[in-house]
């Protein structure tokens, strides 16, 4: 059977194509999958029908990307497990967390003046109707889709997008030059172990070749003092740039070579280093700027984005901490990804679009 995807409202990334028909297992669509309760508010309940649909939509998106590479058993294959959970378990957990977040965000819309207008509702309804009409009854049954579930899915996606924007807008956007300050250097990295041959394949240096590489690197370091770029060209060394600030991670944590950063910190603009020893390599660097204005502005944007993301996470975590969340594990265990979705032929992959920003 074939599913046609549609672009509507936000993130309806249903890369759905064909799959074998076996129905929805034993899912009881009217059973309650998730219950969220608090002392001062009515309980929030999410049905198995909706939760199953949300999970199968996620499955379809993953299948369209990964199934052809990793095989039909990739959902439960322990080779792809992480933190003791296979992919099916991990994605099902993610679906639950997403549903919980979206339902709680819906309850707090008034806190941030967020609304879903009648025009939005009409666009959602139209997109859902198009999706339902584009796909066969058998296909819709397999994914657990109904007009109600598709509308609800798109509605909650829209709520989540607008609430995230509204919450993020309250983050502190004041970032000083001192906090964001970036230094920038250019560098040549000279490997002492491997090189790429003319055919593009990686080869390993012999002991004699390594001796030559080291001698060339030493000569290049001396010449670079007067002509950094010319030396790089002469020895066919690539020149790259790197910007960093006071929050630069250590090399062990994924940052740049510690010895290089230490050298850069001791240099003034225009100064060229000698050979700096790294892990199986040498570096030669030139400090280009002690305060890179462009890089600093980009860093400010990054800091603000991180603050916004953290604030959103803190707010949604707070919503969850304020309620008691119960998942019917027996019902949820029935949802599985045994059948693999495959992408439809290009001619059958049409879109019906609706937007609500």
Regions found by a protein language model. Give the residues of each.
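Basic/polar, acidic-poor N-terminal "presequence/leader" segments
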Residues: 2-3, 25-26
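Sec-dependent N-terminal signal peptides
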Residues: 4-16
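C-terminal motif of bacterial Sec signal peptides marking the signal peptidase cleavage site
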Residues: 19-23
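PPIase-associated folding chaperone regions across multiple families
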Residues: 26-29, 138-212, 255-357
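N-terminal targeting/tethering segments
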Residues: 27-143
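FKBP-type peptidyl-prolyl cis-trans isomerase
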Residues: 30-69, 103-109, 114, 158-167, ...
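Second-shell loop/turn segments in exported
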Residues: 81-96, 105-115, 145-150, 199-223, ...
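Peptidyl-prolyl cis-trans isomerase
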Residues: 215-259, 289
